[in-house]
C-alpha cells in the first residue's frame, strides 16, 4: 500500500488535515504549538484508491525533543511514496521552511507545498510569496473551512495505484490456514442463498427513490425534484424467482461542505447500510452527467467489498451513446469497477428496470461462488507457466498452491515462498485469468499472498 506523509513545522495544521482526510478525529488538534509529537497513521481512501496517511511530528529546532522528531520524520519521508509539506499561510515564508522543503525535494518523490489557513483574500495574496520555493505543485487550503481539498485530492490520485484486488484485511485467513490441509476442500461460512441485501446508493437527486418504487412496483419513498428528499433509509422486500431481495433506499450523498444536520446524519447511515449490504446499485444520472462525487461514492462500494451494478438512470432523457458511455466508465471514471455490469434504465417510466432483478440474482450467485481447489490450482499452474513469475533479485519466486478461503466476496490465498515479491501487476494478471475462467462479473476478488509455514499474512 502506498503512503502519504504530512510534514511541516508545529501548528501549521497537519493534524487538522490528517483528521479531515481520515474523516475522523484521530490526531489531537489545538492551538498549542507542537501538540503532535509522535507520528500518527491511518488508512484512507482518495476517491476509490487506498493509501496509508502518516501525520509526522512537527519539524522544529527549538528543543532537543523536536530534533529527534525531525530526524525520525525525515526517515519516514524516505520510506513514504508522496510528501505533503504544510506551511502556515498567515505567516511569511522563512528560510527554515525552505531548507526543510529542499531537503525533501532531493528524495525524488512526488512532493507538494500545501499552504494552509488561507481563509480570505488577504491570505491568498500572501500565499503568492511561497512561489519562491520553486515548486509547481502548490495548493492553497483552508482545512477549517473545507476549501481547496478537492484539488489536492485530484493531484494525489494521479500518484496512487488503483488496486483491482482488494487487500485482505481480515484475520480469517490465518484462522482458515491453521486448520486447512493442502488439497482438501473447505467448509465455508453459511450464507443465506435465498435472501439478498441490496443497497441503492448515489448522489442527491439521481433517482434512487424512483428506482426503488419501480423495483417494488409501489410508491414507498417520497419522490420530489428537491435535492435530498429522502433522508431516512427505506427498506422494502420483494420475491423474485423464489429469492427474497431486500432493497434499502439510502439518502443521497451531497458534496462536502453542503452536508448539514439531518443530511450529515443520513450520510453516516448510508455508510452503515453499505456495511450490511451484499450488493450495491450505484445509480448515476445520465441526464445531468457524471462528476467527481460519483467516483467517491463508487469508492465507498469498493471500500465495503460489495457486489455492484452500475445503473445509468434517466436514460430516456440522455443523448449519450451506450457503448461509448460504458467504455468511458470502464477506462476512465470507474476503471476500478471494470468488473461491474452497466445497465441503462428509466426509473420513472419503468423501462428496463426488470433487467436489474435478474442481474441482481446473477451477481449474488457470483458473490457467493465456491471454486474447487483442484480447478483453481490447475488455472494458477497454467497461468504461471504461460507467464512465469518474475525473480526477486535473482531468487526464484514460487506459488506452492492456491485455495479459496472465504466467500461473499470470494477470497483466495496464494501460498508462496516469497509473498512480498509478488508485484501488484502480476496479481492483477492472475486475477484476470481467474475472472476469465470463473464468472466473477460484478464482484470484487480478494487475493492474499502468504508465506508457507509462516503465521504472518504477507501482502504486497
UniProtKB/Swiss-Prot annotation:
UniProt entry tagged with the keyword Nucleotidyltransferase: no
Signal sequence coordinates: none
GO terms, molecular function: GTP binding; ribosome binding
Record-listed GTP 1 binding positions: 8-15, 55-59, 116-119
InterPro entries recorded: G_ENGA, GTP-bd, GTPase_Der, KH_dom-like, KH_dom-like_a/b, P-loop_NTPase, Small_GTP-bd
One GO BP: ribosome biogenesis
Keyword terms of this UniProt record: GTP-binding, Nucleotide-binding, Repeat, Ribosome biogenesis
Subunit and interaction comment: Associates with the 50S ribosomal subunit.
HAMAP family linked: GTPase_Der
PANTHER family: GTPASE DER (PTHR43834:SF6)
Record-given protein name: GTPase Der
Native source species: Campylobacter jejuni subsp. doylei (strain ATCC BAA-1458 / RM4099 / 269.97)
Organism placement in taxonomy: Bacteria, Pseudomonadati, Campylobacterota, Epsilonproteobacteria, Campylobacterales
Gene encoding the protein: der
Amino acid at each position: 500500500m502506498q503512503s502519504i506523509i504530512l510534514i511541516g513545522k508545529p501548528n501549521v495544521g497537519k493534524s487538522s488535515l490528517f483528521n479531515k482526510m481520515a474523516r475522523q478525529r484521530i490526531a489531537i488538534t489545538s492551538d498549542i504549538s507542537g501538540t503532535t509529537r509522535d507520528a500518527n497513521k491511518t488508512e484512507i481512501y482518495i476517491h476509490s484508491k487506498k493509501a496509508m496517511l502518516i501525520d509526522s511530528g512537527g519539524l522544529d529546532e527549538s528543543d532537543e525533543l523536536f530534533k529527534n522528531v525531525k530526524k525520525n520524520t525525515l526517515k519516514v519521508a524516505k520510506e513514504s511514496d508522496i510528501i505533503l509539506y504544510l506551511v502556515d499561510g498567515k505567516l511569511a515564508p522563512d528560510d527554515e521552511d525552505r531548507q526543510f522543503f529542499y531537503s525533501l525535494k532531493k528524495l525524488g518523490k512526488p512532493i507538494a507545498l500545501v499552504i494552509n489557513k488561507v481563509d480570505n483574500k488577504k491570505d491568498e495574496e500572501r500565499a503568492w510569496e511561497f512561489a519562491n520555493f520553486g515548486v509547481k505543485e502548490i495548493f492553497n487550503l483552508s482545512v477549517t473551512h473545507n476549501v481547496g481539498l478537492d484539488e489536492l485530492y485530484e493531484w494525489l490520485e494521479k500518484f496512487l495505484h488503483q488496486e483491482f484486488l482488494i487487500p485482505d484485511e481480515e484475520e480469517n485467513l490465518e484462522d482458515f490456514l491453521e486448520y486447512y490441509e493442502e488439497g482438501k476442500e473447505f467448509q465455508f461460512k453459511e450464507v443465506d442463498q435465498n435472501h439478498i441485501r441490496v443497497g441503492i446508493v448515489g448522489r442527491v437527486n439521481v433517482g434512487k427513490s424512483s428506482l426503488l418504487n419501480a423495483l417494488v412496483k409501489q410508491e414507498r419513498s417520497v419522490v420530489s425534484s428537491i435535492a435530498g428528499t429522502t433522508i431516512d433509509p427505506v427498506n422494502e422486500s420483494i420475491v423474485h424467482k423464489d429469492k427474497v431481495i431486500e432493497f434499502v433506499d439510502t439518502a443521497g450523498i451531497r458534496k462536502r461542505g453542503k452536508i448539514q444536520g439531518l443530511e450529515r446524519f443520513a450520510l453516516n447511515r448510508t455508510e452503515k447500510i453499505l456495511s450490511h449490504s451484499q450488493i450495491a446499485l450505484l445509480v448515476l444520472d445520465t441526464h445531468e452527467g457524471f462528476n467527481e462525487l460519483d467516483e467517491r461514492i463508487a469508492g465507498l462500494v469498493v471500500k465495503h467489498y460489495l457486489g455492484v451494478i452500475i445503473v445509468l438512470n434517466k436514460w430516456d432523457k440522455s443523448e449519450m451513446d451506450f457503448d461509448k458511455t460504458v467504455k468511458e466508465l470502464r477506462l476512465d471514471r470507474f476503471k476500478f469497477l471494470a468488473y461491474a455490469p452497466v445497465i441503462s434504465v428509466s426509473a420513472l417510466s419503468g423501462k428496463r428496470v426488470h433487467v436489474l432483478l435478474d442481474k441482481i440474482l446473477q451477481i449474488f450467485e457470483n458473490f457467493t461462488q465456491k471454486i474447487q481447489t483442484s480447478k483453481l490450482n490447475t488455472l494458477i499452474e497454467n497461468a504461471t507457466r504461460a507467464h512465469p513469475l518474475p525473480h526477486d533479485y535473482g531468487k526464484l519466486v514460487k506459488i506452492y498452491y492456491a485455495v479459496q478461503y472465504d466467500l461473499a466476496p470470494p477470497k483466495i490465498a496464494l501460498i508462496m515462498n516469497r509473498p512480498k515479491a509478488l508485484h501488484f501487476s502480476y496479481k492483477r494478471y492472475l486475477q484476470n485469468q481467474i475472472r476469465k475462467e470463473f464468472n466473477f462479473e460484478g464482484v470484487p476478488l480478494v487475493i492474499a499472498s502468504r508465506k508457507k509455514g509462516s503465521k504472518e499474512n504477507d501482502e504486497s
